[in-house]
């Protein structure tokens, strides 16, 4: 690796850290509870879904609270990143106009910021494991980084597409909101994948978000790395990132005039 490439990678990393840190400070400025909100939101939804599906509808899934949060927490990372990415270039319009830097770092910093929030939820998962008489597995040490990197690649691919196209098609945010809500129910977060009738199994087979959620759930609940799901996550992520960067590189020269 050349000295120039090392410098470039170091510069990109420093830039990513600076922008992520800025976004965190802006988000939690004057906030009393700070990072706790990143845990409270999915936990509240988990409590609501537990009441509806376990107590009212009596869904027969063992350790249902743990089952829920191991799906909801990584989903929250993805959904928040995808939704916030729509406005990532718009929110940083002044920086983009006045400073020369790789603009693709902006949606990536958003993904990383939400990833930090996800890491804050892992102690909650550990606490519920102990509640249900279970223990974290040693495989978490390498499993969490492997799946997390895959989710970063996948989510960045989605985010760079959304953040770029939303500058030119502002109706996109409406479609994204509906799409994320639809995909939430098409992904086995509230229910087990084996509860889906055979004729609808394609919903799981062709849904990379299902592979993402099931990868985390297998790791957290069973200590297992499901390489089939992880491979789907990585392959889809690389494809989305390549497509996203192609769209970004084609349209980035018009950012200043749009913003």
Swiss-Prot record:
Species source reads Klebsiella pneumoniae
Encoding gene per record: rfbA
Per the record, the major location class is: membrane
Q: Report the protein name in the record.
A: O-antigen export system permease protein RfbA
Q: Which InterPro entries match?
A: ABC2_TM, ABC2_TM_bact-type
Q: Which residues form the ABC transmembrane type-2 domain?
A: 33-251
Concerning Pfam families, the annotation shows: ABC2_membrane
What's the protein's topology in the membrane? Answer: Multi-pass membrane protein
TM regions (residue ranges): 33-53, 73-95, 111-131, 142-162, 176-196, 228-248
Annotated GO CC locations:
plasma membrane
Provide the GO biological process annotations: lipopolysaccharide transport; polysaccharide transport
Q: Which family does it belong to?
A: Belongs to the ABC-2 integral membrane protein family.
Source domain of life: Bacteria
């Amino acid at each position: 690796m050349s000295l120039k490439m090392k410098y470039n990678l170091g510069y990109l990393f420093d830039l990513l850290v600076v922008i992520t840190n800025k976004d965190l400070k802006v988000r939690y400025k004057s906030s009393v509870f700070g990072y706790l909100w990143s845990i409270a939101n999915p936990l509240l939804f988990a409590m609501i879904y537990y009441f509806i599906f376990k107590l009212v509808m009596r869904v027969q899934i063992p350790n249902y609270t743990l089952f829920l949060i191991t799906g909801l927490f990584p989903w929250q990372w993805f959904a928040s990143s995808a939704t916030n990415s729509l406005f990532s270039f718009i929110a940083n319009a002044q920086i983009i106009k006045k400073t020369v830097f790789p603009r693709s770092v902006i949606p990536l910093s958003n993904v990383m910021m939400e990833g930090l929030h996800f890491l804050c939820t892992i102690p909650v998962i550990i606490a519920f494991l102990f509640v249900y008489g279970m223990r974290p597995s040693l495989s978490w040490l390498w499993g969490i980084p492997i799946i997390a990197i895959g989710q970063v690649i996948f989510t960045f691919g989605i985010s760079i597409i959304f953040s770029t196209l939303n500058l030119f098609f502002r109706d996109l945010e409406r479609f994204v909101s509906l799409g994320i809500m639809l995909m939430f129910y098409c992904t086995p977060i509230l229910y087990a994948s084996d509860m889906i009738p055979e004729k609808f199994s394609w919903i799981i087979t062709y849904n990379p978000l299902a592979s993402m959620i099931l990868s985390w759930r297998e790791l957290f609940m069973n200590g297992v790395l499901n390489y089939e799901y992880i491979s789907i996550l990585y392959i889809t992520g690389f494809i989305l990132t390549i497509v996203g960067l192609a769209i970004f590189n084609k349209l980035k020269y018009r950012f200043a005039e749009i913003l």
